[in-house]
Amino acid sequence: MQNLILYAVSYLLGSIPSGLILAKIFGHVDIKKEGSKSIGATNVLRVLKQTNPKLAKKLAILTVVCDVLKGVLPLIVASFLGASQSVLWTMAVLSVAGHCFSIFLGFQGGKGVATGAGVLAFFLPVEIIIALVVWFLVGKFLKISSLASLCALIALIASSFIIHPELDEIYTHAPILIIAFLVVYKHIPNIVRLLSGKEQKVV
């Protein structure tokens, strides 16, 4: 019963559309109707930057923090409760699934990057540092958020197989690959635009 509660909490917290809520409360704008129509930090920044650059940066950062925490906090609580690695990994997948397919948004949602990074940092801190370095470098020089995220994801997956050939207790990289699949799936429109040279930059 405890595990079922943990799973439900992970999905429901993951489903909270942080960026959408913050943009509506403080920016008085519905980001699902503006810009890329995504609920993530990049769209918060892009949309609000047009009218209030300082607020845009603050809300974008706060969106990232909230999206990370909604994935990490349930894992921290569950670990204190003695949850096994298999339960924790299942919670991680459900948190990202909640963000990508939010029950509060008719099973629409964000791209899962910040929430995915948060839950993976809980298990794979070294790999996340590597991924963040890649994300920063690609983002800084190419200024394309989606490309930076996808390159960081590839770096994380590759480094996880090198640093952790077998994950503790579960002995499989399946949860990482499922999270990666969710993120890539939600990035399909971005990938299409990247291939056609039409993806927007974050200036």
From Swiss-Prot:
Keyword Nucleotide-binding: no
Keywords: Cell inner membrane, Cell membrane, Lipid biosynthesis, Lipid metabolism, Membrane, Phospholipid biosynthesis, Phospholipid metabolism, Transferase, Transmembrane, Transmembrane helix
Top EC class for this record: transferase
EC number annotated for this UniProt entry: 2.3.1.275
GO biological processes: phospholipid biosynthetic process
Pathway it works in: Lipid metabolism; phospholipid metabolism
Membrane topology, from the record: Multi-pass membrane protein
Keyword Lipid metabolism in record: yes
Transmembrane segments: 3-23, 61-81, 87-107, 118-138, 144-164, 172-192
GO CC entries: plasma membrane
Catalytic activity: an acyl phosphate + sn-glycerol 3-phosphate = a 1-acyl-sn-glycero-3-phosphate + phosphate
Superkingdom of source: Bacteria
Compartment(s) where it occurs, according to its Swiss-Prot or TrEMBL record: Cell inner membrane
Any one GO molecular-function label of the UniProt entry: acyl-phosphate glycerol-3-phosphate acyltransferase activity
Described purpose of this protein according to its UniProt entry: Catalyzes the transfer of an acyl group from acyl-phosphate (acyl-PO(4)) to glycerol-3-phosphate (G3P) to form lysophosphatidic acid (LPA). This enzyme utilizes acyl-phosphate as fatty acyl donor, but not acyl-CoA or acyl-ACP.
Complexes and interactors: Probably interacts with PlsX.
Similarity comment: family membership: Belongs to the PlsY family.
NCBIfam families with a match to the protein in the record: glycerol-3-phosphate 1-O-acyltransferase PlsY (TIGR00023)
Full protein name: Glycerol-3-phosphate acyltransferase
Source organism of the structure: Campylobacter concisus (strain 13826)
Gene name tied to this protein: plsY
